[in-house]
Amino acid sequence: RTCYKTPSVKPETCPHGENICYTETWCDAWCSQRGKRVELGCAATCPKVKAGVGIKCCSTDNCNPFPVWNPRG
């Protein structure tokens, strides 16, 4: 399996046994100016996250590109 990974945001081969790609998003102190923080990677199972953290998991190659944010205006 290949997934996008941060910080490079380029497709990389996942370690053996990690067949899930994920996109995790959350707000920090700069969220209102910079948008949500994003982490991309591979996992054996879809990661469990805390309240306030978004997670999307998928199981095809390169299915977790960096999210496109709608500009405020």
UniProtKB/Swiss-Prot annotation:
Entry keyword Ligase: no
UniProt cross-references to InterPro entries, sorted A to Z: Snake_3FTx, Snake_toxin-like_sf, Snake_toxin_con_site, Toxin_cobra-type
Taxonomic superkingdom: Eukaryota
GO molecular function list: acetylcholine receptor inhibitor activity; ion channel regulator activity; toxin activity
GO CC list: extracellular region
Function noted in UniProt: Binds with high affinity to muscular (alpha-1/CHRNA1) and neuronal (alpha-7/CHRNA7) nicotinic acetylcholine receptor (nAChR) and inhibits acetylcholine from binding to the receptor, thereby impairing neuromuscular and neuronal transmission.
Protein name in UniProt: Alpha-elapitoxin-Dv2a
Organism: Dendroaspis viridis
